Amino acid sequence: MAAAKWLIASLAFASSGLAFTPEDFISAPRRGEAIPDPKGELAVFHVSKYNFDKKDRPSGWNLLNLKNGDISVLTTDSDVSEITWLGDGTKVVYVNGTDSVKGGVGIWISDAKNFGNAYKAGSVNGAFSGLKLAKSGDKINFVGYGQSTTKGDLYNEAAAKEAVSSARIYDSLFVRHWDTYVSTQFNAVFSGALTKNGDKYSFDGKLKNLVQPVKYAESPYPPFGGSGDYDLSSDGKTVAFMSKAPELPKANLTTSYIFLVPHDGSRVAEPINKRNGPRTPQGIEGASSSPVFSPDGKRIAYLQMATKNYESDRRVIHIAEVGSNKPVQRIASNWDRSPEAVKWSSDGRTLYVTAEDHATGKLFTLPADARDNHKPEVVKHDGSVSSFYFVGSSKSVLISGNSLWSNALYQVATPGRPNRKLFYANEHDPELKGLGPNDIEPLWVDGARTKIHSWIVKPTGFDKNKVYPLAFLIHGGPQGSWGDNWSTRWNPRVWADQGYVVVAPNPTGSTGFGQKLTDDITNDWGGAPYKDLVKIWEHVHNNIKYIDTDNGIAAGASFGGFMVNWIQGQDLGRKFKALVSHDGTFVGSSKIGTDELFFIEHDFNGTFFEARQNYDRWDCSKPELVAKWSTPQLVVHNDFDFRLSVAEGVGLFNVLQEKGVPSRFLNFPDETHWVTKPENSLVWHQQVLGWVNKWSGINKSNPKSIKLSDCPIEVVDHEAHSYFDY
């Protein structure tokens, strides 16, 4: 047990005297959502911690006492990939990745109070996850998901025959999506049942594919779909799942439906909100999400956007009666926020929803029959909500969340009452020592068209009488935001503790401030958002004395990377000592190489061949812009980034080098749009922070700051001079 002490939060901090370092950031325990038992006494959650010495990330499962916040170890077995409550006291079902079936998983049953006394209920012949269970007579019905073959069988990669050729052949889109070349396998929801024999349950290994009978359907939908894409009714008889519209081109449109199907697969799944269908509200043909049955199984709530090719349209709550032909009802449809998840109260009268509001993921409640103009009420909690579950049959919910100052916040929230704190990681984990809300504050500035929000993040030991270089961090999306939540990649506090004051703006295009601000970036990528950033920089320069803009730096990823490339060719580019562009577009016309065409076709008001002028308008590679380049720039781009090809980063670096602009190219051949592997993440931080620290002067003012020389990776440098030195 001593080897697993990290699984339980330490009660005292180690006295290192150092600020929050990349090593602290990467090695801090990472905790998953806490799921309460049926009685609301205990909650189970996953935890892992990277070990730089051993180069591994052991994981396990903990129990959270919902009365006093105490944490205890349930298991240190890293092969246990998920645990869910059986619905019978403290009994649990878990999936173990090691099984007698090669490439399969085992379904095990145990008791949280005696976890070691587990027994195996059966095996699944392939990768399988996302268990949801409901009692149905003398059985426990369940659903989960895995990959399906074209014939409808659960795909087992380990048992698959090796192809005679590596060729890929396509007659339709997608060719590749996010980080993967699309294959003939696809995600599908499968159903099965646990049968009780005496005091034990068994599984016969038989699964029913509920998705494959609908040609071209897929659920959960990649790349980010999961168990939130489907639900099982409380009686275990009906399954709902979300799929992209099977009859429409998936790369061009976002339209998706909520399908209903019997758990036993006795009928083919049918959509309840098909485009132009008899039950679907007029004009509603966008993306659907978050299907969830009411407690009695008679209704289903889900979220849907209106626009068919816009992934960042406003979601609206919809409710449909199951087994009825009545029109689907829209709930609080005029609320100018975009819900992300929805759940029913135990009596079916109230809906609990999460939505981003002013850069914070908040929890709201509203009546299940709320009229169009109803404004949901906020439930008090700290930080941003990642997930929530009801505590027993009460109105209280267990929130798993985080913030800019803590990577895990477990708390109980009840409408109309103060929240009750159970466990905040920053108060226990040595790696997060010193982090807290006092170093974070909002900033509002008049932007190009409206007031624009930013976060100011200060370093450990901040002194208002001292001066700190500006770190101007630009978020991606572009329809995204810097929220009051923890990032495991771009974390403002890591930057601040190098010796900067971070300003993280939410310019035009950002989410959570009303749909108009989000929509206003359409066909205006380098317009209003750039003007917002200029005005924020000017406000900081003129009004905040403790921020040194003369030695400031700017950095961004994805859209933020584009904006850094755009800034390099604008007047604002001359205001920074260094720039960092991570996975940002460079050549306007290269956007046609992306995966999700609906994204660019919405944001640039047309297809590549019909609206070419819109793609070219915000082209960072225009000669008149390149002529202005002079600020040292680090370019980061990875091989498995299929959102925008690595050639974008190489091309950008080519021009910087030929222009004689101090520059460096950082590439990870095994990473995607994001850098997620721990050792790669450390190198990323060493290079990115080392780069800006060199040019901003931080290396001189803060001896403990990261230097480029801290990185052990050898630099490829075959030339002594720039091309134009000759």
UniProtKB/Swiss-Prot annotation:
Q: Which GO terms describe its biological process?
A: proteolysis
The annotated region (Disordered) lies at 269-291
Keyword set includes Secreted: yes
Q: Where is the active site?
A: S558 (charge relay system), D641 (charge relay system), H673 (charge relay system)
- Where does this protein reside within or beyond the cell? Secreted
**Which UniProt key words apply to this protein?**
Aminopeptidase, Glycoprotein, Hydrolase, Protease, Secreted, Serine protease, Signal, Virulence
**Pfam families recorded for this chain?**
PD40, Peptidase_S9
Which PANTHER family does this UniProt record tie to the protein? DIPEPTIDYL-PEPTIDASE 5-RELATED, SERINE PEPTIDASE S9 FAMILY MEMBER
Name of protein: Probable dipeptidyl-peptidase 5
Whose protein is this, by species? Arthroderma benhamiae (strain ATCC MYA-4681 / CBS 112371)
